[in-house]
Amino acid sequence: VTSLGLGVIGSSSMENERRLPLHPDHLPLLDADLRARITLEHDYGARFGVADAALAPFVAGFASREELIATSDVVLLPKPQLTDVAAMHSGQVLWGWPHCVQDRELTQLAIDQKLTLIAFEAMNHWRRDGSFGLHVFHKNNEIAGYSSVLHALELAGLTGDYGRRLSAVVIGFGATARGAVTALKAHGVHDVAVLTHREVAAVSSPIHSVLMRQFDHTPGDPELSHVITERGREPLAAYLAENDIVVNCTLQDTANPLVYLTEDDVTAFRRGSLVVDVSCDRGMGFSWARPTTFDDPTFTVGDTVTYYGVDHSPSHLWNSATWENSNALIPFLRPVLEGPEAWDADPTLSRAIEIRDGRIINPAILAFQGRSPAEPYALV
């Protein structure tokens, strides 16, 4: 059996990213043979009040960030940036959220450096028949919905518990929407509707305290999108404008993105309305959509709407997010470190390999980036 070493990065090149991949409190719980293959970045647990000396008995050792990225067989780094990938070399494995489909430069670096990318975003528990069961990081997705709503309400100076009664509509119904609804309810916003493409009766595990509504969308023409209400079919944009808070939790198909609102639509919104874009894909969902940062988390659309689009919002609740992500990752430490044969034997890992030794495995990368299907995957 192959025995790879794991370099666990504690700092991030991404602005204000504070999550760790493994929670310091979980390291003592790992099997001894796994701990012997784990090297941490210096000061790994400092933000959690845990010194290196306290973690030393539970890992092989410590190294600098640069050394770990350059020498580890497997680099565990949740939010890799271009500079991180550029510092890696042929044969290494990057395990994190590379989001290569929409990142042409990172993809090119991975091809050129002949890297293997195991993508958190593609790690799912699969049923025996091969169908989708549950996303491995579904709790992180819930925290994304929760954190985005929490942070956006803070920035807008709003709560549903005091002041004018607020109403909200959440677009989509997955883990992020569940987290968004949890945050809205926790902060006194009880008039909440959830829009889903499925028939309301076909939604599994609905949240019983919210109103579920079906909507249908005409690609390329938001004017023809409708919500089915007790009054009949209503135009989507007008329906959204009746609410104080709109939360977008849609998992977009990059080959066929949906747009729910254009800048012309915001004039119908009440002044001070809030659009919380948990999905925050550039140009998708809303015509003006773009990811924002913790340093500059919102901007105004028209004269009426505040738009929030921080695309790594779980970092707002970094301690809780680290705990959930660590719990999700730990079962996969052993198969990842046992190498390619173990990856191939585990559907969660084999189906999450986006690029393998510089070869593109995920066809969505080719389609979205307009690349040739043959190596070296030239842009066409």
Locate each region found by the language model.
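Short glycine-/small-residue-rich Rossmann-like dinucleotide-binding loops
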Residues: D73, K79-P80, P98-H99, T250-T254, ...
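An N-terminal-biased, well-structured beta-alpha scaffold segment characteristic
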Residues: T2-L109
